[in-house]
Amino acid sequence: MLISINAYIPFARPLVYATYRDKLTELVPYMSKVRQIQLKSSQKQDGLLYLVHDWYGGANVPALARAFLSEDLLNWTEESIWNNSEYTTSWHIKTHVFTEAVHCTGKNHFLEDDKGTLIQSRGELIIDPQQIKGTPQQLTVAIARIVENSLGKQIPPNFQQMSQGVCHYLKKEQEIAN
């Protein structure tokens, strides 16, 4: 499944890029499906910034329902490489369930657009049914389709909500500064 999402934010590219890169944990209040984002590591090397974040989903899942769901179904790890000179980030998402079966990777381009920033997110989500362990062979293809459809339906709205969150965050910061 190909991922192709665009978002426009009416702020300058350097500010938008830095907000996505440096303020991710502060954007949680703007994302209804995320409970927490935790920075696990940050390393600069050869002009690139390598970040690892753990995402904790399920914010809109009632606590009672969460008690019956595995936390692994709601959480994931994102590894990203930020290239400041090109205003890009390459990302790789590792699910905590069916980790070997799920391949989700892509790249975001932050482009100057009029007086704002156009973010183009391109990637792919692939589920390999042969890597789904512990289920009867007949079910693995169906499980792969369900997982791919579920994740595929979550990625675009989460990206759009995060972009809207960046916009709200920057407007709030602008109001405080004025």
Task: Cite the ranges covered by each PLM segment.
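Helix-adjacent hinge/juxtasegments
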Residues: 61-84
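A short, hydrophobic/aromatic-rich structural module that often spans a beta strand
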Residues: 1-7, 13, 97-112, 169-178
